[in-house]
From Swiss-Prot:
Keywords: ATP synthesis, Cell inner membrane, Cell membrane, CF(0), Hydrogen ion transport, Ion transport, Membrane, Transmembrane, Transmembrane helix, Transport. GO terms for molecular function: proton-transporting ATP synthase activity, rotational mechanism; proton-transporting ATPase activity, rotational mechanism. F(1)F(0) ATP synthase produces ATP from ADP in the presence of a proton or sodium gradient. F-type ATPases consist of two structural domains, F(1) containing the extramembraneous catalytic core and F(0) containing the membrane proton channel, linked together by a central stalk and a peripheral stalk. During catalysis, ATP synthesis in the catalytic domain of F(1) is coupled via a rotary mechanism of the central stalk subunits to proton translocation. GO terms for cellular component: plasma membrane; proton-transporting ATP synthase complex. F-type ATPases have 2 components, F(1) - the catalytic core - and F(0) - the membrane proton channel. F(1) has five subunits: alpha(3), beta(3), gamma(1), delta(1), epsilon(1). F(0) has three main subunits: a(1), b(2) and c(10-14). The alpha and beta chains form an alternating ring which encloses part of the gamma chain. F(1) is attached to F(0) by a central stalk formed by the gamma and epsilon chains, while a peripheral stalk is formed by the delta and b chains. It is a single-pass membrane protein. It comes from Anaeromyxobacter sp. (strain K). CDD domains: ATP-synt_Fo_b. This is ATP synthase subunit b. It is found in: Cell inner membrane. Coiled coil: none annotated. The keyword Transcription does not apply.
């Protein structure tokens, strides 16, 4: 047993090629004992720990895949929601533009109608006033003619006297109108 604990001169007896059967046997026995001890006490916990680690890694990978799929689903839903909002905004803008155009046309038509009505009313009033003025003028002309005729009949003057009488009467006209 003392030879087991003593150092073996590897190079002294001929080098590495020399095999010592006792040392080989004890090395094999030690290896097998260590293998049995490790197998009985360490191998189970190591395998269990590796299995647990593998399970936790698989769960983490599965969880990451689920979260990624959920994130992609949410992203697609968000993109669809954004596209829908943009379509609705464009539709609302188009409808507002149509309403503004319709209102503009309605107001323009209403303004034209009111302007046409005002022009028609003004023309009617002008025609009425013109008719009144013509009637009044005719009445004044008739009065003037009657007055001039009565003066001519009373005076029975020659042409020169008649002309002077008419000119005098015409000169008095603005005074008659003001009165």
């Amino acid at each position: 047993m003392a030879s087991f604990l003593s150092p073996v001169p590897v190079l002294a007896a001929g080098g590495i090629a020399d095999i010592n059967p006792g040392l080989t046997l004890w090395t094999a026995i030690t290896f097998l004992v260590m293998l049995v001890v490790l197998g009985k006490f360490a191998w189970g916990p190591i395998v269990k720990m590796l299995a647990e680690r593998e399970r936790s890694i698989r769960e983490a990978i599965d969880s990451a895949k689920k979260e990624r799929a959920e994130a992609e689903r949410l992203l697609a839903a968000q993109k669809e929601s954004l596209a829908k909002a943009q379509r609705e905004a464009a539709e609302l803008a188009r409808r507002n533009q149509q309403e503004v155009e319709a209102l503009r046309q309605e107001l323009t038509a209403k303004a034209r109608k009111e302007a046409d009505e005002l022009v028609a009313e003004a023309r009617r009033q002008i025609a009425e006033e013109l008719g009144k003025a013509k009637t009044e003028l005719k009445a004044q002309v008739v009065d003037l003619a009657i007055d001039a005729a009565s003066r001519l009949v009373k005076a029975n003057l020659d042409e020169k006297a008649q002309r002077a009488l008419v000119e005098e009467y015409i000169a008095q006209l603005p005074a008659n109108r003001a009165a």
